[in-house]
Amino acid sequence: MSAPSNVELDPGAVRGLVARAGDPKRERWLDQVRRTGACRHPVRLRGVVLRGDEPVYSTAGEPDGALMVRCGNRREACCPSCAHEYRGDMWQLVYAGMAGGRKGVPESVAEHPMVFASLTAPSFGAVHTRRDDGRACRCGTRHAPDDVDLGQALDPTSYDYECAVLWNWHAPALWNRFMVELVRVLAMRAGVSEREWRQRSRVAYAKVAEFQARGLVHFHAIIRLDGAQDRALAPGVTVSADELAAAIAEAAGRTSLVSEAGNGETVELRFGEQLHTRILAGDGGEVCAEQVAAYVAKYSCKASHEQITSRDSDPDRWCERGVPEQLVQMAAAAIGLSQRPGLRGLGGWVHMLGFRGHFVTKSRGYSTNLGTLRADRAAYRAQQDEPDETQDDSMPVLGFWQYLGSGYLNPGDALLAAGVEASLRAAREALLDARRVPL
Protein backbone atom coordinates (compact mmCIF):
# COMPACT_ATOMS: atom_id res chain seq x y z
CA MET A 1 0.00 0.00 0.00
CA SER A 2 1.51 3.33 -1.05
CA ALA A 3 0.70 6.88 -0.05
CA PRO A 4 -1.83 8.82 -2.17
CA SER A 5 -0.05 10.19 -5.24
CA ASN A 6 -1.61 13.66 -5.05
CA VAL A 7 -0.15 14.48 -1.62
CA GLU A 8 2.97 16.63 -1.33
CA LEU A 9 5.24 14.85 1.14
CA ASP A 10 7.10 16.71 3.87
CA PRO A 11 10.38 15.36 5.28
CA GLY A 12 8.64 13.90 8.34
CA ALA A 13 6.23 11.96 6.16
CA VAL A 14 9.08 10.64 4.00
CA ARG A 15 10.98 9.43 7.07
CA GLY A 16 7.85 7.70 8.34
CA LEU A 17 7.18 6.01 5.00
CA VAL A 18 10.78 4.78 4.75
CA ALA A 19 10.72 3.48 8.32
CA ARG A 20 7.46 1.60 7.80
CA ALA A 21 8.66 0.17 4.47
CA GLY A 22 11.62 -1.40 6.28
CA ASP A 23 9.57 -2.61 9.24
CA PRO A 24 9.49 -6.44 9.32
CA LYS A 25 6.03 -6.17 10.90
CA ARG A 26 4.70 -3.89 8.17
CA GLU A 27 2.05 -6.35 6.96
CA ARG A 28 0.73 -6.86 10.47
CA TRP A 29 0.61 -3.07 10.90
CA LEU A 30 -1.41 -2.77 7.67
CA ASP A 31 -3.69 -5.55 8.90
CA GLN A 32 -4.35 -3.54 12.07
CA VAL A 33 -5.15 -0.47 9.96
CA ARG A 34 -7.61 -2.48 7.87
CA ARG A 35 -9.25 -3.94 10.98
CA THR A 36 -9.94 -0.41 12.21
CA GLY A 37 -11.37 0.50 8.81
CA ALA A 38 -8.44 2.91 8.37
CA CYS A 39 -9.66 5.02 11.29
CA ARG A 40 -8.29 8.58 11.15
CA HIS A 41 -7.39 8.72 14.86
CA PRO A 42 -6.98 5.14 16.13
CA VAL A 43 -6.57 4.55 19.85
CA ARG A 44 -3.27 2.81 20.62
CA LEU A 45 -3.34 0.35 23.52
CA ARG A 46 -0.74 -1.72 25.34
CA GLY A 47 -1.88 -4.78 27.23
CA VAL A 48 -2.26 -8.48 27.78
CA VAL A 49 -5.14 -10.98 27.74
CA LEU A 50 -5.14 -13.80 30.29
CA ARG A 51 -7.11 -17.04 30.29
CA GLY A 52 -6.95 -17.95 33.93
CA ASP A 53 -3.31 -17.28 34.83
CA GLU A 54 -1.94 -17.99 31.36
CA PRO A 55 -1.28 -15.18 28.84
CA VAL A 56 -3.00 -15.83 25.51
CA TYR A 57 -2.27 -12.47 23.87
CA SER A 58 0.14 -9.61 24.38
CA THR A 59 0.78 -6.43 22.46
CA ALA A 60 4.50 -6.99 22.99
CA GLY A 61 4.60 -8.81 19.67
CA GLU A 62 2.61 -6.17 17.77
CA PRO A 63 4.11 -3.42 15.58
CA ASP A 64 5.25 -0.57 17.83
CA GLY A 65 4.17 -2.69 20.81
CA ALA A 66 0.58 -1.51 20.49
CA LEU A 67 -2.86 -2.60 19.33
CA MET A 68 -4.89 -0.06 17.35
CA VAL A 69 -8.67 0.16 17.80
CA ARG A 70 -11.25 2.52 16.32
CA CYS A 71 -11.66 6.01 17.77
CA GLY A 72 -15.44 5.58 17.47
CA ASN A 73 -16.13 9.21 16.52
CA ARG A 74 -19.49 9.39 14.75
CA ARG A 75 -18.74 12.73 13.04
CA GLU A 76 -18.03 12.40 9.32
CA ALA A 77 -15.66 15.38 9.38
CA CYS A 78 -13.55 13.82 12.15
CA CYS A 79 -13.36 10.18 11.03
CA PRO A 80 -15.11 9.02 7.83
CA SER A 81 -14.45 5.36 8.64
CA CYS A 82 -15.98 5.35 12.13
CA ALA A 83 -18.81 7.56 10.87
CA HIS A 84 -19.51 4.99 8.13
CA GLU A 85 -19.76 2.20 10.70
CA TYR A 86 -21.94 4.31 13.00
CA ARG A 87 -24.17 5.27 10.08
CA GLY A 88 -24.60 1.61 9.17
CA ASP A 89 -25.53 0.71 12.75
CA MET A 90 -27.99 3.58 12.86
CA TRP A 91 -29.59 2.45 9.59
CA GLN A 92 -30.09 -1.05 11.00
CA LEU A 93 -31.53 0.30 14.25
CA VAL A 94 -33.96 2.70 12.58
CA TYR A 95 -34.99 0.36 9.77
CA ALA A 96 -35.69 -2.54 12.15
CA GLY A 97 -38.15 -0.37 14.06
CA MET A 98 -40.06 0.44 10.87
CA ALA A 99 -39.96 -2.80 8.88
CA GLY A 100 -39.78 -5.35 11.72
CA GLY A 101 -38.75 -8.95 11.21
CA ARG A 102 -35.10 -8.30 12.12
CA LYS A 103 -32.87 -7.47 15.08
CA GLY A 104 -35.43 -8.94 17.46
CA VAL A 105 -38.25 -6.63 16.36
CA PRO A 106 -41.51 -8.44 15.46
CA GLU A 107 -42.77 -8.19 11.88
CA SER A 108 -46.14 -6.89 13.06
CA VAL A 109 -44.79 -3.42 13.89
CA ALA A 110 -44.73 -2.62 10.18
CA GLU A 111 -48.54 -2.55 10.26
CA HIS A 112 -48.83 -0.23 13.23
CA PRO A 113 -49.73 3.46 12.80
CA MET A 114 -46.42 5.13 11.99
CA VAL A 115 -45.46 8.66 10.91
CA PHE A 116 -42.22 10.35 9.90
CA ALA A 117 -42.36 13.85 11.39
CA SER A 118 -40.04 16.85 11.15
CA LEU A 119 -40.31 19.44 13.94
CA THR A 120 -38.54 22.72 13.26
CA ALA A 121 -37.19 25.62 15.28
CA PRO A 122 -39.01 28.97 15.22
CA SER A 123 -37.65 32.13 13.63
CA PHE A 124 -35.38 34.42 15.62
CA GLY A 125 -34.89 36.82 12.74
CA ALA A 126 -34.91 36.78 8.94
CA VAL A 127 -32.14 34.79 7.22
CA HIS A 128 -31.05 34.20 3.65
CA THR A 129 -33.11 31.30 2.26
CA ARG A 130 -33.57 29.35 -0.95
CA ARG A 131 -37.18 28.94 -2.05
CA ASP A 132 -38.43 25.77 -3.70
CA ASP A 133 -40.78 27.74 -5.96
CA GLY A 134 -37.89 29.64 -7.54
CA ARG A 135 -38.76 32.99 -6.01
CA ALA A 136 -35.93 35.24 -4.89
CA CYS A 137 -34.88 35.59 -1.27
CA ARG A 138 -35.88 38.73 0.62
CA CYS A 139 -32.45 40.08 -0.25
CA GLY A 140 -33.42 39.90 -3.95
CA THR A 141 -31.09 36.99 -4.79
CA ARG A 142 -31.99 33.50 -5.99
CA HIS A 143 -29.49 31.57 -3.91
CA ALA A 144 -27.80 28.44 -5.23
CA PRO A 145 -27.95 25.32 -3.01
CA ASP A 146 -24.30 25.78 -1.99
CA ASP A 147 -24.44 29.56 -1.50
CA VAL A 148 -22.41 30.49 1.59
CA ASP A 149 -24.97 33.17 2.48
CA LEU A 150 -27.73 30.62 3.15
CA GLY A 151 -28.72 30.68 6.80
CA GLN A 152 -26.97 33.99 7.49
CA ALA A 153 -28.99 36.72 9.18
CA LEU A 154 -30.28 39.41 6.84
CA ASP A 155 -29.81 41.92 9.65
CA PRO A 156 -27.33 40.65 12.28
CA THR A 157 -28.04 43.67 14.50
CA SER A 158 -31.67 42.63 15.02
CA TYR A 159 -31.26 38.83 14.97
CA ASP A 160 -31.91 37.33 18.43
CA TYR A 161 -28.83 35.12 18.80
CA GLU A 162 -29.34 34.66 22.54
CA CYS A 163 -32.86 33.25 22.14
CA ALA A 164 -31.63 31.03 19.32
CA VAL A 165 -28.98 29.55 21.63
CA LEU A 166 -31.54 29.14 24.43
CA TRP A 167 -33.78 27.26 22.00
CA ASN A 168 -30.95 24.84 21.19
CA TRP A 169 -30.15 24.53 24.90
CA HIS A 170 -33.71 23.55 25.79
CA ALA A 171 -34.56 21.61 22.60
CA PRO A 172 -34.19 18.16 24.29
CA ALA A 173 -36.52 19.24 27.11
CA LEU A 174 -38.95 20.67 24.57
CA TRP A 175 -39.00 17.30 22.79
CA ASN A 176 -39.76 15.51 26.09
CA ARG A 177 -42.66 17.88 26.70
CA PHE A 178 -43.89 17.24 23.18
CA MET A 179 -44.00 13.49 23.86
CA VAL A 180 -46.06 14.08 27.01
CA GLU A 181 -48.37 16.41 25.10
CA LEU A 182 -48.76 13.87 22.28
CA VAL A 183 -50.17 11.27 24.69
CA ARG A 184 -52.57 13.87 26.07
CA VAL A 185 -53.80 14.75 22.59
CA LEU A 186 -54.15 11.09 21.56
CA ALA A 187 -56.12 10.33 24.73
CA MET A 188 -58.34 13.38 24.28
CA ARG A 189 -59.06 12.49 20.66
CA ALA A 190 -59.88 8.90 21.66
CA GLY A 191 -62.22 10.06 24.42
CA VAL A 192 -60.32 8.30 27.21
CA SER A 193 -58.17 9.44 30.12
CA GLU A 194 -54.39 9.61 29.80
CA ARG A 195 -54.07 6.80 32.33
CA GLU A 196 -56.38 4.54 30.36
CA TRP A 197 -54.58 5.37 27.11
CA ARG A 198 -51.20 4.48 28.64
CA GLN A 199 -52.62 1.21 29.95
CA ARG A 200 -53.66 0.22 26.43
CA SER A 201 -51.14 1.89 24.11
CA ARG A 202 -47.60 3.20 23.95
CA VAL A 203 -45.65 5.67 21.81
CA ALA A 204 -42.35 4.41 20.40
CA TYR A 205 -39.96 6.67 18.52
CA ALA A 206 -36.49 7.20 17.09
CA LYS A 207 -35.31 10.72 16.31
CA VAL A 208 -32.28 12.53 14.95
CA ALA A 209 -31.29 16.16 15.42
CA GLU A 210 -30.18 18.06 12.31
CA PHE A 211 -28.37 21.38 12.37
CA GLN A 212 -29.75 23.86 9.86
CA ALA A 213 -27.55 26.43 8.12
CA ARG A 214 -28.88 29.07 10.55
CA GLY A 215 -27.40 27.09 13.46
CA LEU A 216 -30.66 25.76 14.93
CA VAL A 217 -31.53 22.09 15.38
CA HIS A 218 -34.56 20.42 13.83
CA PHE A 219 -35.87 17.02 14.89
CA HIS A 220 -36.73 14.26 12.40
CA ALA A 221 -38.56 11.39 14.08
CA ILE A 222 -40.24 8.08 13.33
CA ILE A 223 -43.22 7.90 15.69
CA ARG A 224 -45.02 4.55 16.06
CA LEU A 225 -47.92 3.36 18.20
CA ASP A 226 -47.76 -0.06 19.89
CA GLY A 227 -49.64 -2.04 22.48
CA ALA A 228 -48.83 -0.98 26.02
CA GLN A 229 -47.28 -4.27 27.17
CA ASP A 230 -46.05 -5.82 23.93
CA ARG A 231 -44.75 -4.00 20.87
CA ALA A 232 -45.81 -6.94 18.73
CA LEU A 233 -49.42 -5.94 19.37
CA ALA A 234 -51.27 -3.04 17.78
CA PRO A 235 -52.23 -0.14 20.06
CA GLY A 236 -55.20 -0.91 22.28
CA VAL A 237 -56.80 2.40 21.33
CA THR A 238 -57.69 2.42 17.63
CA VAL A 239 -55.80 5.18 15.80
CA SER A 240 -55.18 5.52 12.07
CA ALA A 241 -51.90 6.82 10.67
CA ASP A 242 -53.69 9.96 9.47
CA GLU A 243 -55.08 10.53 12.96
CA LEU A 244 -51.61 10.06 14.43
CA ALA A 245 -50.21 12.66 12.01
CA ALA A 246 -52.94 15.12 13.03
CA ALA A 247 -52.27 14.47 16.71
CA ILE A 248 -48.55 15.12 16.19
CA ALA A 249 -49.30 18.48 14.58
CA GLU A 250 -51.67 19.48 17.38
CA ALA A 251 -49.28 18.37 20.13
CA ALA A 252 -46.37 20.27 18.57
CA GLY A 253 -48.46 23.43 18.48
CA ARG A 254 -49.45 23.06 22.13
CA THR A 255 -45.95 22.36 23.44
CA SER A 256 -44.05 25.22 25.10
CA LEU A 257 -41.37 25.80 27.69
CA VAL A 258 -40.50 28.92 29.70
CA SER A 259 -36.77 29.50 30.11
CA GLU A 260 -34.85 31.81 32.40
CA ALA A 261 -32.60 34.05 30.32
CA GLY A 262 -30.26 34.58 33.26
CA ASN A 263 -30.84 38.34 33.36
CA GLY A 264 -34.10 38.34 35.28
CA GLU A 265 -36.19 37.87 32.14
CA THR A 266 -37.95 34.77 30.82
CA VAL A 267 -38.43 33.47 27.30
CA GLU A 268 -41.20 31.20 26.03
CA LEU A 269 -39.84 28.59 23.63
CA ARG A 270 -41.91 26.68 21.09
CA PHE A 271 -41.48 24.64 17.94
CA GLY A 272 -41.60 26.47 14.63
CA GLU A 273 -44.72 26.78 12.51
CA GLN A 274 -43.27 24.54 9.79
CA LEU A 275 -44.07 20.92 10.58
CA HIS A 276 -43.97 18.07 8.09
CA THR A 277 -45.57 14.65 8.56
CA ARG A 278 -45.50 11.70 6.19
CA ILE A 279 -47.25 8.39 6.74
CA LEU A 280 -44.98 5.35 6.92
CA ALA A 281 -47.44 2.57 7.67
CA GLY A 282 -50.96 2.04 8.97
CA ASP A 283 -53.55 3.10 6.41
CA GLY A 284 -51.05 3.70 3.61
CA GLY A 285 -47.42 4.69 3.28
CA GLU A 286 -46.17 7.90 1.66
CA VAL A 287 -42.45 7.11 1.99
CA CYS A 288 -40.56 3.81 2.24
CA ALA A 289 -38.69 2.62 5.32
CA GLU A 290 -35.35 2.28 3.49
CA GLN A 291 -35.38 5.95 2.49
CA VAL A 292 -36.26 7.19 5.96
CA ALA A 293 -33.62 4.98 7.60
CA ALA A 294 -30.98 6.31 5.20
CA TYR A 295 -32.11 9.89 5.86
CA VAL A 296 -31.88 9.52 9.63
CA ALA A 297 -28.56 7.64 9.43
CA LYS A 298 -27.05 10.38 7.26
CA TYR A 299 -27.81 13.13 9.76
CA SER A 300 -26.62 11.02 12.68
CA CYS A 301 -23.03 11.67 11.53
CA LYS A 302 -23.30 15.43 11.07
CA ALA A 303 -22.11 18.14 13.47
CA SER A 304 -22.91 21.82 13.89
CA HIS A 305 -20.27 22.47 11.18
CA GLU A 306 -17.49 20.35 9.73
CA GLN A 307 -14.86 22.84 10.93
CA ILE A 308 -16.14 22.90 14.53
CA THR A 309 -14.94 20.23 16.98
CA SER A 310 -15.47 19.57 20.67
CA ARG A 311 -11.81 20.46 21.25
CA ASP A 312 -12.19 24.00 19.94
CA SER A 313 -14.81 26.30 21.45
CA ASP A 314 -13.12 29.58 20.53
CA PRO A 315 -15.27 31.31 17.89
CA ASP A 316 -12.43 33.73 17.10
CA ARG A 317 -10.50 30.84 15.55
CA TRP A 318 -13.56 29.59 13.68
CA CYS A 319 -13.49 32.59 11.34
CA GLU A 320 -10.01 31.59 10.17
CA ARG A 321 -11.36 28.19 9.13
CA GLY A 322 -14.30 29.53 7.16
CA VAL A 323 -17.06 28.92 9.70
CA PRO A 324 -20.08 31.09 8.73
CA GLU A 325 -20.58 34.31 10.67
CA GLN A 326 -24.04 33.16 11.79
CA LEU A 327 -22.51 30.27 13.74
CA VAL A 328 -19.71 32.44 15.09
CA GLN A 329 -22.28 34.90 16.45
CA MET A 330 -24.29 32.08 18.04
CA ALA A 331 -21.15 30.72 19.70
CA ALA A 332 -20.35 34.18 21.04
CA ALA A 333 -23.91 34.41 22.39
CA ALA A 334 -23.50 31.00 24.06
CA ILE A 335 -20.31 32.17 25.76
CA GLY A 336 -22.07 35.31 26.97
CA LEU A 337 -25.06 33.37 28.29
CA SER A 338 -22.77 30.93 30.12
CA GLN A 339 -21.63 33.78 32.37
CA ARG A 340 -25.16 34.26 33.72
CA PRO A 341 -26.64 32.52 36.78
CA GLY A 342 -28.35 29.25 35.96
CA LEU A 343 -26.70 28.93 32.56
CA ARG A 344 -23.11 28.10 33.56
CA GLY A 345 -23.32 24.72 31.87
CA LEU A 346 -23.68 26.35 28.47
CA GLY A 347 -19.93 26.95 28.38
CA GLY A 348 -19.32 23.26 27.76
CA TRP A 349 -21.58 23.25 24.70
CA VAL A 350 -20.34 26.24 22.73
CA HIS A 351 -19.12 23.95 19.94
CA MET A 352 -22.72 22.66 19.66
CA LEU A 353 -24.18 26.17 19.66
CA GLY A 354 -25.90 25.34 22.93
CA PHE A 355 -27.43 22.00 21.90
CA ARG A 356 -26.65 19.53 24.69
CA GLY A 357 -28.64 16.49 23.62
CA HIS A 358 -27.61 13.33 21.82
CA PHE A 359 -27.98 13.58 18.07
CA VAL A 360 -29.90 10.29 17.95
CA THR A 361 -32.28 9.11 20.66
CA LYS A 362 -35.02 6.49 20.79
CA SER A 363 -37.57 5.11 23.17
CA ARG A 364 -36.69 1.82 24.85
CA GLY A 365 -39.23 -0.26 22.94
CA TYR A 366 -38.64 1.15 19.47
CA SER A 367 -36.00 -1.27 18.24
CA THR A 368 -32.69 -2.84 19.19
CA ASN A 369 -29.81 -0.74 20.57
CA LEU A 370 -26.28 0.16 19.52
CA GLY A 371 -24.73 -1.98 22.25
CA THR A 372 -26.42 -5.10 20.90
CA LEU A 373 -25.42 -4.31 17.32
CA ARG A 374 -21.79 -3.80 18.35
CA ALA A 375 -21.76 -6.99 20.41
CA ASP A 376 -23.14 -8.92 17.43
CA ARG A 377 -20.43 -7.48 15.19
CA ALA A 378 -17.69 -8.33 17.69
CA ALA A 379 -19.00 -11.90 17.97
CA TYR A 380 -19.08 -12.23 14.19
CA ARG A 381 -15.50 -11.00 13.86
CA ALA A 382 -14.36 -13.37 16.59
CA GLN A 383 -15.88 -16.27 14.64
CA GLN A 384 -13.75 -15.34 11.63
CA ASP A 385 -10.54 -16.02 13.55
CA GLU A 386 -9.14 -19.54 13.75
CA PRO A 387 -10.27 -21.08 17.07
CA ASP A 388 -7.66 -22.58 19.39
CA GLU A 389 -9.16 -25.96 20.29
CA THR A 390 -6.49 -26.55 22.95
CA GLN A 391 -7.80 -23.72 25.13
CA ASP A 392 -10.04 -24.38 28.11
CA ASP A 393 -13.20 -22.36 27.44
CA SER A 394 -14.32 -22.77 31.05
CA MET A 395 -11.53 -20.51 32.29
CA PRO A 396 -12.33 -16.78 32.66
CA VAL A 397 -10.72 -14.40 30.16
CA LEU A 398 -9.44 -11.07 31.47
CA GLY A 399 -7.81 -8.20 29.61
CA PHE A 400 -5.54 -5.54 31.08
CA TRP A 401 -5.04 -2.45 28.92
CA GLN A 402 -3.12 0.80 29.08
CA TYR A 403 -3.87 3.83 26.92
CA LEU A 404 -0.81 4.93 24.94
CA GLY A 405 -2.27 7.66 22.78
CA SER A 406 -4.49 8.48 19.81
CA GLY A 407 -3.57 8.89 16.17
CA TYR A 408 -0.68 7.58 14.11
CA LEU A 409 2.91 7.85 15.29
CA ASN A 410 4.09 9.96 12.35
CA PRO A 411 2.82 11.64 9.15
CA GLY A 412 4.10 8.74 7.04
CA ASP A 413 1.90 6.24 8.86
CA ALA A 414 -1.05 8.62 8.50
CA LEU A 415 -0.48 8.79 4.73
CA LEU A 416 -0.33 5.01 4.42
CA ALA A 417 -3.57 4.74 6.40
CA ALA A 418 -5.15 7.34 4.09
CA GLY A 419 -4.28 5.08 1.16
CA VAL A 420 -5.95 2.13 2.89
CA GLU A 421 -9.00 4.31 3.58
CA ALA A 422 -9.24 5.28 -0.09
CA SER A 423 -9.06 1.61 -1.14
CA LEU A 424 -11.75 0.57 1.34
CA ARG A 425 -13.99 3.44 0.26
CA ALA A 426 -13.56 2.54 -3.42
CA ALA A 427 -14.45 -1.08 -2.66
CA ARG A 428 -17.63 0.00 -0.83
CA GLU A 429 -18.65 2.28 -3.70
CA ALA A 430 -18.03 -0.48 -6.25
CA LEU A 431 -20.21 -2.84 -4.22
CA LEU A 432 -23.01 -0.25 -4.07
CA ASP A 433 -22.76 0.33 -7.82
CA ALA A 434 -22.99 -3.40 -8.45
CA ARG A 435 -26.14 -3.62 -6.34
CA ARG A 436 -27.76 -0.83 -8.33
CA VAL A 437 -27.30 -2.63 -11.65
CA PRO A 438 -30.31 -4.89 -12.39
CA LEU A 439 -29.50 -8.48 -13.30
Range-by-range predicted roles:
Residues 129-166:
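A solvent-exposed, charged loop/short amphipathic helix patch at secondary-structure junctions
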Residues 79, 117, 196-230, 296:
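Histidine-centered divalent-metal-coordination microenvironment in nucleic-acid enzymes
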Residues 222-264:
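Helical (often loop-to-helix) elements that flank the catalytic cores of nucleotide-handling enzymes
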Residues 63-114, 119-136:
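Long, contiguous juxta-domain segments that are non-catalytic but functionally important
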Residues 1-87, 271-439:
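Long, low-complexity, charged/polar intrinsically disordered accessory regions
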Residues 215-221, 255-282:
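Acidic/histidine-rich catalytic neighborhood
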Residues 168-200:
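A short, contiguous, amphipathic alpha-helix enriched in charged residues
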Residues 64-68, 102-107, 191-213:
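Catalytic micro-motifs at enzyme active sites that drive phosphoryl/nucleotidyl and oxygen chemistry
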